Amino acid sequence: MDDNKAKALKAALGQIEKQFGKNTIMHLGDNSATLDVDVVSTGSLGLDIALGIGGLPKGRIIEIYGPESSGKTTLTLQAIAECQKQGGTCAFIDAEHALDPIYARKLGVNTDDLLVSQPDNGEQALEITDMLVRSGALDMIVIDSVAALTPRAEIEGEMGDSHMGLQARLMSQALRKITGNAKRSNCMVIFINQIRMKIGVMFGSPETTTGGNALKFYASVRLDIRRIGAVKSGDEIIGNQTRVKVIKNKMAPPFRQAEFEITYGEGTNHLAEVIDLGVEIGVVGKAGAWYSYGDEKIGQGKANSVLFLKDNPAIAEEIEAKIRAEKLAVEPEKGAEAVDEVEPESEVE
């Protein structure tokens, strides 16, 4: 760049910082430009690895969707518990009015410190979310769920009234405000979403998520969570076998997936994941039904090995640290997304 252009650029940058504040614009290579993203674990080791950065990114919009009883709320409550362990403050916007505090405590959530709101309508829920984000005091906000964010006009109207695209416009308007504020305050906003079926789809998947297209565009990470089987103890079903696909990821390559067990009343079977992933990378040895770590046998069968790790948390942490070091050693590609996308302007649901 020649001297005249350099002087003009310096003057422009000075004027921008004077008018809009320091660090409004900067070179990407500056030390003041934060490139490393803070993350919060999902509570599932396999999913943290599938996300490519070790967890969910702070300061971003996240969407978690799937069928009923697939583990969406469980996953978000585990993320809240992990965020609280880091000293973070979290809020739960319970639009479905279905939060179970007893179950939340079982998953490790400190319910005394968790902020909870049960809004009357969608506008109120999103306004509360935006105010909390702008406060700069929160680290994570969960909205459960997008489908329950009913517009005020629909609540005040008659049954059977048509409100075409009202929720989609509400979401689009709210996300335009929340996205920038979330980045500035480094607050993660997680939207739980439900699945609906499109009518008359001949080819491709008829499934779609509620709330229009805006959330698909603004979300940095989209997770598709499904129940793929049952976990049994004898004849009794004690949990779900769950698969989570990373449908979109702006922080690392997308389309990775993780499979893990969710035990009823307990959440993700974290230690079973540690054993499976340990065997995969060779940290944990497996000979027949026996599992071993180093020269020590840790159990016959996975269930006994899990009990051993539960009684020896230091060994479990050591194995997990080796797994994370091995699996997250490669620097992820930045800006990888599932599909080419266009900014949403006008949309209907």
UniProtKB/Swiss-Prot annotation:
Signal peptide bounds: none
GO cellular component: a single term: cytosol
Keyword DNA repair set for record: yes
Keywords: ATP-binding, Cytoplasm, DNA damage, DNA recombination, DNA repair, DNA-binding, Nucleotide-binding, SOS response
Superkingdom, taxonomy of origin: Bacteria
PROSITE patterns: RECA_1, RECA_2, RECA_3
InterPro entries, sorted: AAA+_ATPase, DNA_recomb/repair_RecA, DNA_recomb/repair_RecA_CS, P-loop_NTPase, RecA-like_C, RecA-like_N, RecA_ATP-bd, RecA_C_sf
One Pfam family from the record: RecA_C
Listed GO MF terms: ATP binding; ATP hydrolysis activity; ATP-dependent DNA damage sensor activity; damaged DNA binding; single-stranded DNA binding
Intracellular or extracellular location(s): Cytoplasm
Residues bound to ATP: G66, P67, E68, S69, S70, G71, K72, T73
Coiled-coil zones: none
GO BP terms: DNA recombination; DNA repair; SOS response
Family assignment from sequence similarity: Belongs to the RecA family.
Biological role: Can catalyze the hydrolysis of ATP in the presence of single-stranded DNA, the ATP-dependent uptake of single-stranded DNA by duplex DNA, and the ATP-dependent hybridization of homologous single-stranded DNAs. It interacts with LexA causing its activation and leading to its autocatalytic cleavage.
UniProt xrefs under HAMAP family: RecA
Protein name (Swiss-Prot/TrEMBL): Protein RecA
Organism of derivation: Psychrobacter sp. (strain PRwf-1)
Gene (name only): recA
